[in-house]
Amino acid sequence: CYSPVQYRVAYNLNPLYKRGITGAGKTIVIVDSFGSPTIANDLHVFDQQWGFADPELQVMKFGNVPPFDPNDPTMVGWAQETTLDVEYAHAIAPGAKIVLAETPVAEVEGTSGFPEMMAAEKSLIDRGIGDVITQSFGATENTFPGFDNGNFSSLLNLRFAFKDALAHKVTVLASSGDDGATNAMSDASTLFPFPVNSWPSSDPLVTSIGGTQLHLDNSGNR
């Protein structure tokens, strides 16, 4: 586990910061199911730990987001994901404003959670909020209803936010998944025994961001 300071060295970000390229004047939209009730304080503690200035953070709820239940493992998992997403978006682009969009339904395999997420994204785009949308989530295409039979309507019907982003020149990113060339089945734990794609990273209007495995020497270099 590396610190944000180590990431800045490993990915040669410090020369960008010296040139004034920090994300200042731009807004990063982060979309997560449920969000985290402690995100503002968590981010502040993170910034104090690493010597960063607090960014402008705006939390927006879309739909009837339920109260946080610390005994709900799904909510706890999303709170952890939210914290990771927000803290490291800020660490890499310290000058950018961050908008956290919280949605009311958990995104899992298949279409669950996606309609609410896409509606939130379109709402923000239509209001001119966000230069970049980052989506650290995804579901295997094969878990969408009808996909294996050549019926892609359940997936295609969710693309409206991305078409809107294209029209408004908003960059949309998505993680490619956690398991290399495969991904989870509908049970969210068993992996497909053959190569599959994760959506929305597979969408042609989305930039897919693949995972990396970082190894540093004692000087912080790769």
Positions of PLM-derived features:
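Substrate-binding/charge-relay-adjacent region of secreted/lumenal peptidase catalytic domains
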Residues: C1-G211
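Predominantly extracellular beta-rich ligand-binding scaffolds that present long acidic/polar faces
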Residues: V206, L216-R222
